UniProtKB/Swiss-Prot annotation:
Gene3D superfamilies: 4'-phosphopantetheinyl transferase domain. It comes from Burkholderia thailandensis (strain ATCC 700388 / DSM 13276 / CCUG 48851 / CIP 106301 / E264). This is Holo-[acyl-carrier-protein] synthase. Its EC number is 2.7.8.7. The gene is acpS. The lineage of its organism: Bacteria, Pseudomonadati, Pseudomonadota, Betaproteobacteria, Burkholderiales. It is found in: Cytoplasm.
Amino acid sequence: MAIYGIGTDLAQVSRIAAVLERTGGRFAEKVLGPDELRVFHARRARSEARGIAFLATRFSAKEAFSKAIGLGMHWPMTWRALQTLNRPSGEPYVVASGGLAEWLDARGITARVTVSDERDYAVTFVVAEAPDDVVAARSGAAS
């Protein structure tokens, strides 16, 4: 396995809060996958700030992932096709669905993700990995 790509994103929590307020909550439904949306609602019910911070980290994760795989936010990379969930230990991991899952599987791409947030910002770093021949073909190098 070799590094296919890396991506990072920094989201301003207040900007995410403003968009959520302006859209009457529709922003969360547009951006979050079903499992993420459940966590968002649960966290927001306990604390508005925790809900907004969660949304900011997930928005940031999708942006960083789209950069790591080199597609940006273009098909098959869509907001809801990628979810960042947490293992019981708290470790974040990504789950792709639909066309994105097929695209990743066809290339053997896997990813590692880390997310962090403070009061004002959420940051994500993603490392996408793929078999050596896929990375070599992408970079134009001979196998």
